[in-house]
Amino acid sequence: MKLTCVLIIAVLFLTACQLTTGEQKDHALRSTDKNSKLTRQCTPVGGYCSRHHHCCSNHCIKSIGRCVAH
C-alpha cells in the first residue's frame, strides 16, 4: 500500500515537472489545432446522424439514422 502511494506521488511529481519545464515552440499552432478539434460540424436535414454525427436541427431519428427538421 505504501509502495503504491509512493509510486503514484512520484509519477504525479514527474508529470508536474514535465509540464512546468516543457518548451512550447509552436504555441500558436497548438492553440489553432485545439480550437479546430473543439469546433464541431453539424449534419444538414436529411443527412446521416449518429452518436458522433450531430444534426444542425438537433433532431435525429436514430432508428433510421437521419436528421429531420423540427
Curated annotation (Swiss-Prot):
UniProt keyword annotations, A-Z: Disulfide bond, Knottin, Neurotoxin, Pyrrolidone carboxylic acid, Secreted, Signal, Toxin
UniProt GO cellular component terms: extracellular region
Q: Does the keyword ATP-binding apply?
A: no
Pyrrolidone carboxylic acid modification sites?
41
Report the GO molecular function annotations. Answer: ion channel inhibitor activity; toxin activity
Cysteine-cysteine disulfides: 42-56, 49-60, 55-67
User: What subcellular compartments does it reside in?
Assistant: Secreted
Taxonomically, which superkingdom?
Eukaryota
Pfam families referenced in this protein's UniProt entry, alphabetically: Conotoxin
Tissue localization of expression is: Expressed by the venom duct.
Renumbered to this chain, the signal peptide range is 1-22
Propeptide residue interval(s): 23-40
Q: Which family does it belong to?
A: Belongs to the conotoxin O1 superfamily.
Q: What is known of its domains?
A: The presence of a 'disulfide through disulfide knot' structurally defines this protein as a knottin. The cysteine framework is VI/VII (C-C-CC-C-C).
Q: What name appears for this protein in its UniProt entry? A: Conotoxin ArMKLT2-0111
